[in-house]
Amino acid sequence: MDSQVRQNYHRDCEAAVNRMINMELFASYSYTSMAFYFSRDDVALPGFAHFFKENSDEEREHADKLLTFQNSRGGRIFLQDIKKPERDEWGSGLDALQSSLQLEKNVNQALLDLHKIASDHTDPHMCDFLETHYLNEQVESIKKLGDFITNLSRMDAVKNKMAEYLFDKHTMGGKN
């Protein structure tokens, strides 16, 4: 049955929103993997665990917003399989942050592509929705991750585990 509320909502936009929902859920799934890796007894970096758990929750909220948007525009939700994260072992905090940065850049590019599709189909509602709820937040997340990576690299945290521990405790808010 067709939606009664659908107006100026192109099928390409609808399909792209469904793909974006999947990408946000994949990001949440990846961050969940990172969070529980860092809370293992042999890794024990609670600040990193907390940071990645918060990121997982945030990505899930992004997916929920897109699901709500899809319904409000009269689109249909077609969930897809969520891909497994690229790995199960995340290495050091620096390694995980570098993976996180790449993930956020991929999400950002997908959002920019989604915005272009909306713009090409003259959908000001979708453009406004993406600009209001996603685009600036992505840039801020990428900047924050870049700053964390710079500081951990500056402290030579790969070789200096005390630096990683202190970064976890003081920057990431880890508590024993």
Swiss-Prot record:
CDD domains: Euk_Ferritin
Residue ranges of every copy of the Ferritin-like diiron domain listed in the record: 7-156
Tissue occurrence: Liver (at protein level).
Reaction it catalyzes: 4 Fe(2+) + O2 + 4 H(+) = 4 Fe(3+) + 2 H2O
EC number(s) per entry: 1.16.3.1
Gene3D superfamilies, alphabetized: 1.20.1260.10
GO annotation, cellular component aspect: cytoplasm
Residues engaged in binding Fe cation 2: 59, 104, 138
The UniProt record lists the keyword Repeat: no
Top-rank lineage group of the source organism: Eukaryota
Coiled coil: none
Keyword terms of this UniProt record: Iron, Iron storage, Metal-binding, Oxidoreductase
Oligomeric and partner information: In liver, forms a heteromer consisting of middle and heavy subunits. The functional molecule forms a roughly spherical shell with a diameter of 12 nm and contains a central cavity into which the insoluble mineral iron core is deposited.
Described purpose of this protein according to its UniProt entry: Stores iron in a soluble, non-toxic, readily available form. Important for iron homeostasis. Has ferroxidase activity. Iron is taken up in the ferrous form and deposited as ferric hydroxides after oxidation.
Family listed: Belongs to the ferritin family.
Protein name: Ferritin, liver middle subunit
Record organism: Trematomus bernacchii (Emerald rockcod)
